[in-house]
UniProtKB/Swiss-Prot annotation:
Any one GO molecular function term: rRNA binding
UniProt protein name: tRNA/tmRNA (uracil-C(5))-methyltransferase
Domain of life: Bacteria
Family: Belongs to the class I-like SAM-binding methyltransferase superfamily. RNA M5U methyltransferase family. TrmA subfamily.
Function text: Dual-specificity methyltransferase that catalyzes the formation of 5-methyluridine at position 54 (m5U54) in all tRNAs, and that of position 341 (m5U341) in tmRNA (transfer-mRNA).
Gene3D superfamilies (UniProt xref): 2.40.50.1070, Vaccinia Virus protein VP39
Annotated GO biological process: tRNA methylation
Keywords for this protein: Methyltransferase, S-adenosyl-L-methionine, Transferase, tRNA processing
EC nos: 2.1.1.-, 2.1.1.35
Amino acid sequence: MTSSYHQQLQAKIDRITTQFSEFTPPTLEVFESPEQHFRMRAEFRIWHTENDMFYAMFERNDDGKQKTVVRIDEFPIADKSINDLMPLLLAELKANSLLSQRLFEVDFLATLSGEMLVTLIYHRKLNQEWEQEAKALAEKLNIKIMGRSRGQKIVIGDDFVVEEFELLNRSFKYKQIESSFTQPNAQVCKKMLQWACDAAEGSKKHLLELYCGNGNFTLPLSLKFERVLATELAKSSVYAAQWNIEQNQIDNIQVARLSAEEFTQAYQGEREFRRLQEADIDIQSYDFDTVFVDPPRAGIDDETLKLLQSFERIIYISCNPNTLYENLKTLTQTHRVTKFALFDQFPYTHHVESGVLLEKI
């Protein structure tokens, strides 16, 4: 581990340990990232000059008011497959005016399983000639390509990749849709999944999961419970979760298209939802003892926090330590922290991903 990586990680460890000390958690478990090639997605602007074009990012000056263009020829934090493809793709784009004309952004989405989706974003309408050239390029480079411009989306191959993780003595396949959220650091994601499954060990009843996304945690956690009810509001994520459940041949998960707030209303009998009836989901048939949450950066609303306090165990993955801290002020009134983890999803940034297991006092 290099000194620069170690220093930034130690700074996060010190910050989190100090911030959460009032909750007297056990010793912090630390899950490191690879130092390079850990990001499975990358987005670049395309910068055109009179006789050249290149990948670019912008660097703001100290007061944040001015931006400087930074040429990017390689991107060490991105997966090796992205770095290998970058110069090959750029050379092909430069050599083809139909593909390079008014191209302003290129996005890469890679997987550990070897798939690659490249999105080319334009400031012009894409026509049939563009589509023919894009198909030829996709075949030549063995990649999937999407073309986007205002009001247009042209898919060459698929608009998704399929990731595959080995975990709990089996493999899990995940559909990752181009425009939907996915965990960017696949190696750390695997460590998060294993930690969550360890935290769930020993359950005798059912699992409720809020904010399930594409089923990233849902699939492996289903091996630890008799039944799982997962909720998610975004239609594209629900679709991906259902595809993932089917592809992985898992038969003990139901997905409800509800927000956390809506689930609370349904669970407490305050409101009926046609979406539940149409999906043949009877919430009252579940006997939950554990709830798993991976909320957005804003954390969990007050009504949902009250709901969580009724469960024996709460497994909470957080992408924002400040909202986790605020939520724990409420949750530790009824529960104690029995596991505490830091996942270095975003090395060399201030960002921290953390996990806590809370058990009823």
